[in-house]
Every structure is written in structure tokens, then in C-alpha cells.
């Protein structure tokens, strides 16, 4: 269903001051030590046959990135969990436009897919008998709820959510504050940028990370960015199969 060309897959920091990193380490770190985002050193060539399910397409598209990962054999199971709800492509009235529905997850946000993928991946990468990892999330609404849902009551993880007080809707505030257990939510007197700055400061603090294992579930995390490719690929493949274009 796919073929891969080229050298071994590594991930580089956008700031260029971190050595190329294997995907497992990039997923666990969330943010590169130099404060940059991890991105693939190259984009592999992938030939994909349209799968019957979104989970199958996700597996086929993501496999080259996980070829040398300890998660390789678990990838079908991870995808089955993360993409267990569909992302249907609906035709709209007019000139052939279509709408990709990404609101069928537990928190009605497109971020549910990647948050669930990341939670499954980090759970499997977590060393046995290790202390809990704290997931730090800055949010303006949707991200925090999706991450909270994905990690809620998941062994070995705590979640800290930061959101700007008075700058989310009442429904979003409820979605951020309703969890309890291993999820703690804090209102920040400031903007989303202030929340993001606090999260990045924590993730870049080596002394703090030595004391408390930290990771990110914001879109700065490779584990959030990469899984989002799947539903676009799935929609494009099926559109081409059905419409021939």
C-alpha cells in the first residue's frame, strides 16, 4: 500500500540547533531542546490505495514516519483508536464544493483525532514503572478539551491546562473545567499568547523537566501535527476515486 524511498527518517528542529532526532524521542519531548518544532527532515514518497476506513488510510500514510519507531507494530492499533470516528466529505450545493466534517469526535473538535493519537502513542512509549508525565497545554478552547478527553484517567499522565480567563465561551470553559481526576485547569489573567508563553517556558526549562517529566500536546508537538495529515489524505483519495479528479 505504500513505498518508502531514501535514508532513515529523522526529525529536525525548526531552529536548527538540535541534532536530528528519532520519532519516538521527538514525540516524548514535544518541543525540541532549542525551543523549535520537530519536523521531518524529508517528506517520504508514499503510494496509498484508498482505504475503506479513515484508520486504514491513517496507518498507510503514517507508516513511513514510524518505520524505525518502537511503535511500528502497534501503529494499526493506535490508528484504530485515534480514528475510530469518521471524517465524512459532504457535497455542498453549488459548483461542486465539498465540506470535510471534523466534528464527530468526543469534544466535537478536529483536534480529537491527533489528541487521541498522541495519548495512545505516549502511553506505549512510557517506560514501565516510570513516574507520571505532565502534559502542559495552552488553549483558547478546543485544544484543551480534546487533550483532556484523550488523557483523562489515563495511567501515568497528568494534564495541566492553561486558558485565558474571560476569552473563551461558556461552553468551552465547561469543556475545559469538567474533568477532574488527573486533569487540572487554570485560568490565566492574560491572552492565549501569555498561556502559550508559560507553556513554552516550562517545556524549555531543563531543570524543571529533570524534576518533573513534561511534554506538550499543543500543535507545537509533532504528535499533534503529523496525525492531522490523515484525514486530508483520506478525503483527497476518496474524492479522486469517486470523481476521477
Give the ranges of each region predicted by the language model.
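Short, Lys/Arg-enriched N-terminal segments with co-localized hydrophobic residues
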Residues: 1-8
Amino acid at each position: 500500500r505504500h513505498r518508502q524511498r531514501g535514508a532513515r527518517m529523522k526529525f529536525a528542529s525548526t531552529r536548527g540547533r538540535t541534532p536530528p532526532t528519532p520519532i519516538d524521542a521527538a514525540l516524548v519531548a514535544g518541543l525540541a531542546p532549542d525551543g523549535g518544532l520537530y519536523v521531518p527532515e524529508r517528506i517520504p514518497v508514499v503510494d496509498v490505495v484508498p482505504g475503506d476506513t479513515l484508520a486504514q488510510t491513517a496507518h498507510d500514510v503514517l507508516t513511513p514516519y514510524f518505520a524505525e519507531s518502537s511503535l511500528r507494530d502497534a501503529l494499526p492499533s493506535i490508528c484504530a483508536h485515534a480514528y475510530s470516528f469518521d471524517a465524512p466529505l459532504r457535497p455542498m450545493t453549488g459548483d461542486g464544493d465539498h465540506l470535510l466534517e471534523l466534528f464527530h469526535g468526543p469534544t466535537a473538535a478536529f483536534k480529537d483525532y491527533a489528541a487521541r493519537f498522541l495519548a495512545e502513542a505516549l502511553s506505549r512509549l512510557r517506560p514501565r514503572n516510570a513516574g507520571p508525565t505532565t502534559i502542559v497545554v495552552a488553549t483558547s478552547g478546543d485544544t484543551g478539551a480534546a487533550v483532556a478527553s484523550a488523557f483523562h484517567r489515563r495511567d501515568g499522565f497528568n494534564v495541566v491546562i492553561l486558558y485565558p480567563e474571560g476569552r473563551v465561551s461558556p461552553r468551552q470553559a465547561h469543556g475545559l473545567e469538567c474533568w477532574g481526576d488527573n486533569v487540572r485547569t487554570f485560568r490565566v489573567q492574560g491572552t492565549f499568547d501569555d498561556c502559550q508563553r508559560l507553556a513554552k517556558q516550562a517545556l524549555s526549562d531543563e531543570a524543571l523537566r529533570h524534576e518533573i517529566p513534561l511534554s506538550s500536546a499543543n500543535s507545537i508537538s509533532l504528535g499533534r501535527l503529523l496525525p492531522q495529515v490523515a484525514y486530508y489524505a483520506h478525503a483527497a483519495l476518496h474524492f479522486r476515486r469517486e470523481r476521477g479528479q
